[in-house]
């Protein structure tokens, strides 16, 4: 997928505290503040550090990291929404419900990450998230976040 990003890696790094090797979002393809939704992309390469041990003979992306990538994509949207409070608050991944893994993600895959918030409040939020490779859903779940003061962590 060669869509021009709405937000590039520098923008993402301004919105998320994650850095290599744990930054799992490469670009934001679109977001909509009215529907509270976001679409992001992760290019999965054989150079990912987790492929060294998961699994050398048949590398697949760990499911928990697919969920983390979804949470990071949702976190970017929360960062945009929190624009005025970004210096004071940070969204932390609180939990996941109904997680399902449907297909393996392999080196060379382009992971499309979609999240839509069903709830955003001063205390946190909930989002429905799905990861795709092509038109196939590879993972999905309901993500929960808590908003905390940066000084408290």
Swiss-Prot record:
Major location category of this protein: cytoplasm
InterPro entries: FabA_FabZ, FabZ, HotDog_dom_sf
Source organism superkingdom: Bacteria
Pfam short name (any one): FabA
Keyword annotations: Cytoplasm, Lipid A biosynthesis, Lipid biosynthesis, Lipid metabolism, Lyase
One annotated Gene Ontology cellular component of this protein: cytoplasm
PANTHER family: 3-HYDROXYACYL-[ACYL-CARRIER-PROTEIN] DEHYDRATASE (PTHR30272:SF1)
Family from the record: Belongs to the thioester dehydratase family. FabZ subfamily.
Record's protein name: 3-hydroxyacyl-[acyl-carrier-protein] dehydratase FabZ
Source organism of this protein record: Chlamydia muridarum (strain MoPn / Nigg)
């Amino acid at each position: 997928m060669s869509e021009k990003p709405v937000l590039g890696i520098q923008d993402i790094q301004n919105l998320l505290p994650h850095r290599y090797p744990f930054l799992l979002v490469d670009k934001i393809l679109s977001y909509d503040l009215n529907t509270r939704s976001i679409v992001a992309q992760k290019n999965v390469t054989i150079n990912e550090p987790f492929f060294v041990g998961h699994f050398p003979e048949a590398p697949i992306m760990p499911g928990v990291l697919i969920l983390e990538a979804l949470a990071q994509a949702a976190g970017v949207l929360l960062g945009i929404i929190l624009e005025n409070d970004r210096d004071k608050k940070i969204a932390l991944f609180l939990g996941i419900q109904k997680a399902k893994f449907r297909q393996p993600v392999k080196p060379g895959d382009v992971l499309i990450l979609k999240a839509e918030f069903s709830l955003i409040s001063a205390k946190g939020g909930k989002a429905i998230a799905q990861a795709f490779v092509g038109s196939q859903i590879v993972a999905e779940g309901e993500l929960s976040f808590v908003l905390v003061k940066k000084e408290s962590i």
